[in-house]
Amino acid sequence: MVLRVGTDNAALDWLDDVERARRAAGLRRELRARSEIDRVVDLASNDYLGLVRHPEVVDGAVDAVRRWGGGATGSRLVTGTTSDHELLERELASFVGAESGLVFASGYAANLGAVTALSGQDALIVSDAGCHASLVDACRLSRARVVVAPHADVDFLRRALAERAEERALVLTDSVFSADGDLAPLADMHRVCRDHGAVLLVDEAHGIGVRGRGGRGLVHEMGLAGEPDVVVTATLSKSLASQGGAVLASRKVRAHLIDAARTFIFDTGLAPAAVGAARAALSVLRREPQRATAVLDRARDLARITGAAAPESAVVSVVLGDPEVAVAAAAACRNRGLHVGCFRPPSVPEGTSRLRLTARATIDVAEMAVIESVLAEVLSERRAGVPA
């Protein structure tokens, strides 16, 4: 037995080494609190439809708090389900063309709950290499055999499913990938899944509100809405201007998740304010479907300004390579009144650190002028090697 004697905090001394290594690599992250009135132009948030401060969305949250209180009070299975939760589930399912819906406390929890409940030790999971971290973590927790497929490689998927020994299989993909904004080949993936008896689970976090008729998502756009072997997961925190997540699928899947999804069973239900805000945002989107089209129009404007590839979603990536260059560029934008995202490893592969711009339907002419001026200056400076 080895006896280790040290100071009170010696057990965590290793964190100092980790922090130094992160700083040396340009990968240290810090929090920056927003003020109530932020004077910068926003190209960093996921408020794609510009609904976060919409009066109806704010009123929806306030009204729900007045009727139900500040919290859900318990698990969805005990006291945490209100009639508003059930209304939101039906409204979301109807909007995307699913048979039923189940609301979770976050999009992350929805993915963890759905994947672990629909897999297990006797299943195979094939997960796209570009999947969101929540799906990656779900794979780790699933106890299934996991195969990571090269990004958008349908032939690899076909071979993995054909060669499996497991009776059950679950295929995971984002509809719109968050780093580059590219689209999954959903129609081809579904054909392969149908041929080989696999379930296709699609994370529509960046698809709903942007892709499909009136923002119904890429699954709907590809004609896969309501298919019994397709499970859609979604977040309420992007286009729907709130917080929380949902699984939209068949009634059979919903019933199973209520019994088996641990992130549903053992977590407190979504707060009433978030439910009310999401319902109001969905109502606005139904009434104003042109918001979805406007997001893609603004994304094309951003691509033109930066010289990026024509976008298929709200996400426009400007790859700069080195993480310190990307951080400096983001800081230079901020100092000139423009807030942009900055993606570095492990969010993206080594050597592909980038500015990540997210389009918003409500960007106006004055804001676009600021965007064009600042991005032109900053990108010119970075590419010329001018220090921040």
What are the roles of these predicted feature ranges?
Residues 51, 55, 59, 63, ...:
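PLP-dependent enzyme catalytic core of the Aspartate aminotransferase-like
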Residues 147-202:
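Active-site phosphate-binding strand-loop segment of PLP-dependent enzymes
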